[in-house]
Each structure stands twice: as structure tokens, then as C-alpha cells.
């Protein structure tokens, strides 16, 4: 049974105003880990975090017991794209995010693998491999996130995730398992034997982060729609099994927006489920 006092649990937190404010926001709702974007998540933003903000971020990181800090790639990049212009911008966005992580002292960057847009798995794998192997790691660990099984999406199956992991060579790398995505892709993580399958396929040591999200739609829906903990189709019992199976790993929630009070209550609820 996991020790709730050792549980690293938090949210994806806004960086509105300035990136260093994320620590105070995370602390105010009880986070002991957090995830952020390092820039505009909805645009092609290749800018570096201003030095003054980066220095303040590093300073704030020493004031709070909020660790590890994870960054997430923005929404637009598609490293499996057949469109050369999009592919080039996506690769540039990956390097920019890595550079910002290195400047901020963030060790982990979560990334989606993208969509091959009908060109096939082999094509998508080749594009992803080339993109990742072309960028400088700067000591930042890339965490490959599983997908929900959407049409043409790369990384929905455990086998595909492992294939990409093996293809990108000797660099800092690992996995981020999203519970909603896994459930939507057809993995019934409410069952201990399925959780064991996930762990055995990817290697427990390689799984560095769990995105702890309930699922708005049913098993195998292929719909990426997160739900608040206990209010979706995975449910409290399923979430509890996930917490126990991945004991010792950090958990980040990306559940629907709620007030600070509601976020604190949800976080406390998760701690209870971990007992």
C-alpha cells in the first residue's frame, strides 16, 4: 500500500502572468508536483523564457516542496506529419521546449507523438525518430505519452510506444501514461492484470509520470475527454488501483477546470484513494 505522505500528486498549472507564478498557484491547491507549459500552448512559439522570469522560476522552485516539475509540449506540433513545413516547425518547437526546460531547470518534457495523417505507422515512426534524434537533449528527459486511439494517432498501443522508445536511441527518455487515454484506447486499467500488462510492456522504471484522469466516455471509445476523478468510467475503484500499481511515481491531474477549493478537494480525494 502506498504511503500517502510520500505521494507526489498535483495538477497542470497555469503560467498566466509569469511562469514563476505557477509555484504559488500549485502550492495554494496542495500540489506536491506540477506540470506547466513553458510558453503559449496554442501557437508556434519558439521564444525563450526571458532571463528575469527564468531566474525567478529557479528561485521559487527552492521555496516550495513541489517536485518534480514537468513541462508539456504545446498542442500544435506534429512530429509524424507528412507536411514538410509543419514537420520543420514541429521539430523547431520541440527544440525550443527543450531549451526552455534546460533554462528553467525542468528535467522532464511530456510529448505527444503526433499523427501520420494516413501515411501509415512506418512513415510516422520514421518521422518521429528523425525529429527526436535531430534535436539536442540538453539533459532533458523526453516522456512519450500514450494516445487515446484516435484515427492515425501514433502511440495509442503499448507496442507502438515501446517501438518509438527503442527507435530514438541512447538519449534521456521515458514514458508518461495517461489513464484516460489508455482506457479510451481499450486498456481496461480498472483490472490489475491490465495494469500489470502496461508495466511489463514498458518497464516500471521507464514510466516516469502518470497523468491521472478519469474518462468521460467508455472503454475503447477512442475519445480523449478527461473527467474529474471518480466521476467518469474509470471511477474511484479504478483510480485507486492505478495509484497502487504505480506507487512511488508522480501523478499529474489534467481534469476539467474547477475552483481552487474544488481542486483542493479533488486532490484530497485522490490521497484517500491511495490509502
Q: For each predicted feature, which ranges?
A:
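Acidic (Asp/Glu)-rich catalytic clusters
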Residues: 24-31, 50-70, 95-105, 133-139, ...
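Active-site beta-loop-alpha junctions enriched in small/polar residues
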Residues: 12-16, 37-41, 74-76, 114-116, ...
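Acidic-and-aromatic substrate-binding clefts and catalytic sites of carbohydrate-active enzymes
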Residues: 15-21, 41-52, 78-80, 116-121, ...
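Active-site acidic/histidine proton-transfer and metal-coordination neighborhood
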Residues: 63, 79-174
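Conserved, mostly hydrophobic/aromatic
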Residues: 26, 72, 90, 101, ...
